[in-house]
Amino acid sequence: MSADVPVTVAAVRAVARDVLALELRHANGQPLPGASAGAHIDLALPNGLVRQYSLVNATGQATMDCYQVAVGWDANSRGGSVWIHEKLKVGQALRVTHRATCSEMAPEHRRVLLLAGGIGVTPIYAMAQACAQQGVDVELWASARSAPRLAYLEELKALLGQRLHLHADDEQGGPMNLTERLATQRWDAVYACGPAPMLDALTAATAHWAPGSVRMERFKGAEQPASERQPFELVLQRAGLSTTVDAHESVLDAMERVGVDFPWSCREGICGTCEAPVLEGEVQHLDYVLSPEERAEQRRMMVCVSRCGGGRLVLDI
């Protein structure tokens, strides 16, 4: 979905320390387009920002009465979470500008482990509901810095019972030991969402697992050190345009600077919306969308984060 949908904030409630849950309903009272578990929406805020939030209640319905999202407080954010926590009120008019699914569940996976860290529980909670509805054998490990920060705790307990395993870092003396817990592959797949250290640990702990059995959603893409960024020439073949991408800007920034309106959503390398075909150039892939095989082909890139390792990049745009 790419057309704007006007929504109204119907309810706001706290679901954990520093986590607010929002209930969004169509401004005209109509049903909202449905979505599969793992989907997110782009929410346009009155302060001009557009932010992505996972749909907590998306389980594959054709239509939905409301969209439910949760927003964690982040003092270092670019303004989205702070505005919602400090300014948002019931009755506020907002716009949903896009809906997409980055981590759709595979139907062939019948024994599933869900792994959530912090606010990463939002898409994972939706997946847990979908698994329960579809009769999938599911287990969920949820972790947070402290127990009061575990969002949707009561709902998860009611849904999963003994299949829910909780981990509070402050009570356990540190993060969950995934290397020890995942030494043996007992599931068809793991779906995970959480902070980078948790997902990096998951990647290392499951390196011996079957390819494609670990799927994760990150909060943001990888960052290339400033010292490694070099300017390069960007050629947009079909548009007949060329420009220099400076060290401090992205390919997407440069495209917009020369007047090319290209679709994007996250600007973090995690959603796949800004995928572009590559005709020439050595791509430095910094996204979390493409597989290692797709990266090696050097045929496409996410222009919001990935760069060129040589002096010239030619895109089929």
UniProtKB/Swiss-Prot annotation:
It comes from the Bacteria. Monomer. Part of the p-toluenesulfonate methyl-monooxygenase complex TsaBM, comprising the reductase TsaB and the oxygenase TsaM. PROSITE patterns: 2FE2S_FER_1 (PS00197), 2FE2S_FER_2 (PS51085), FAD_FR (PS51384). This is Toluene-4-sulfonate monooxygenase system reductase subunit TsaB1. Disulfide bonds: none annotated. InterPro entries: 2Fe-2S_ferredoxin-like_sf, 2Fe-2S_ferredoxin-type, 2Fe2S_fd_BS, Beta-grasp_dom_sf, FAD-bd_FR_type, FNR_nucleotide-bd, MRET, OxRdtase_FAD/NAD-bd. Its cofactor is FMN. GO terms for biological process: catabolic process.
